[in-house]
């Protein structure tokens, strides 16, 4: 019987040696600071996302421009940007227009599958509030103290901003409601003021209008990626009409933008170059342009969610201190900084009161294998030598 016990002990000891051989003795623990650097090296360094969506047209025959804007509004909301961080500027004269055969609705497709206007929209500037002055004041935050916070672009140096314009334009200008124009230099200077006032980390500027590319040619501020629907002396075209509505319901450039984005989820790793690949002449019927010289990252490294989505909070386990620390936090509301302050005060209270945090050790599969083998050896030895 003792021979059997001895054999059992030897087998257990062999299992212990095999398990020990699998262990990498040179394994290295990466601390939280290094982990944060690894994460930030491959992603944008922004901490919050905003969207400015503007339809500069009015009147019934410009139905498609409002549909363009509401379509992108629906997309960025689906991707995670909250209404509190979306500024929507519309003439808002389509849904309740007496010519509308479907009162209170706006569609972007002839199948009328989605009512863009009925999806709990929040219009920040409507009707005659959609002016060049208000648009520039919005970008530069030049308001008096009584201006509502809900109608301000409350960005900072860590903000990624998606700016979308659609309407009627020409060579280096875009019309606002057939009453005034914003020029390419006006837009460029507004972006420069934003940069000087540290109001953005990166900007993605998209414009869908005739001769759209001329509107981004004068921009000179860094970290701005631009795309337009047509080059100089080219028109931008609508995609199709709805015979029941009686007018065109969406433009070609925005249609193919949405067609691609509808396949993208909020946690997707799809990059911007994949979207740009959709802007072919066969699709758009014009020559879209992309300006990347002011942008510091390659478009094949820029995630669509860097601008169309909302960055999420990442929490890493500090192995050394045993404390959960927020490495990259994107506030979902104005209470985020208050929560951080409360957390610091709470930790200070624990420290002053003599409390100590104990590191929780998570057993790996290899460690579990070793523990099992050691236990088996111990039991085998006890079984072998404990009996007379």
Walk through the language-model features, giving the residues of each.
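Classical eukaryotic N-terminal signal peptides for Sec-dependent ER targeting/secretion
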Residues: 1-11
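Cysteine endopeptidase catalytic domains of the caspase/legumain-like
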Residues: 16-388
């Amino acid at each position: 019987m003792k021979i059997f016990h001895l054999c059992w002990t030897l087998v257990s000891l062999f299992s212990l040696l095999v398990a020990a051989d699998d262990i990498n003795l040179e394994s290295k623990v990466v601390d939280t600071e290094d982990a944060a650097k690894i994460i930030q090296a491959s992603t944008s360094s922004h901490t919050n996302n905003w969207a400015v969506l503007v339809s500069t047209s009015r009147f019934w025959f410009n139905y498609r421009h409002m549909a363009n804007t509401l379509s992108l509004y629906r997309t960025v909301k689906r991707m995670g940007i909250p209404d509190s961080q979306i500024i929507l500027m519309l003439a808002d004269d389509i849904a309740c227009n007496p010519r509308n055969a479907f009162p209170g609705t706006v569609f972007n497709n002839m199948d009328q599958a989605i009512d863009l206007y009925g999806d709990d929209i929040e219009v920040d500037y409507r009707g005659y509030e959609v002016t060049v002055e208000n648009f520039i004041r919005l970008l530069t935050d030049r308001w008096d103290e009584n201006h509502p916070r809900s109608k301000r672009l409350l960005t900072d140096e860590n903000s990624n901003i998606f700016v979308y314009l659609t309407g009627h334009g020409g060579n280096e200008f875009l019309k606002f409601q057939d009453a005034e124009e914003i020029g390419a230099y006006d837009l460029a200077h507004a972006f420069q003021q934003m940069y000087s006032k540290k109001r953005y980390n990166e900007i993605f500027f998209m414009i869908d209008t005739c001769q759209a590319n001329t509107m981004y040619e004068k921009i000179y501020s860094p970290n701005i990626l631009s795309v337009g629907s047509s080059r100089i002396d080219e028109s931008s075209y609508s995609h199709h009409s709805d015979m029941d509505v009686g007018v065109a319901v969406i433009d070609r450039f925005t249609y193919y933008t949405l067609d691609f984005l509808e396949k993208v989820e909020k946690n997707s790793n799809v990059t911007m170059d994949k979207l740009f690949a959709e802007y072919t002449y066969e699709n758009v019927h014009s020559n879209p342009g992309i300006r990347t010289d002011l942008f510091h990252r390659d478009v094949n490294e820029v995630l669509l969610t860097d601008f169309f989505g909302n960055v999420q909070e990442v929490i890493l386990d500090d192995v050394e201190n045993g404390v959960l620390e927020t490495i990259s936090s994107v506030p979902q509301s104005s209470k985020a900084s208050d929560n951080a302050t409360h957390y610091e005060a709470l930790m200070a209270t624990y420290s002053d009161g003599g409390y100590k945090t104990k590191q929780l050790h998570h057993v790996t599969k290899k460690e579990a294998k070793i523990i099992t083998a050691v236990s088996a050896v111990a039991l085998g030895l006890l079984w072998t030598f404990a009996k007379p």
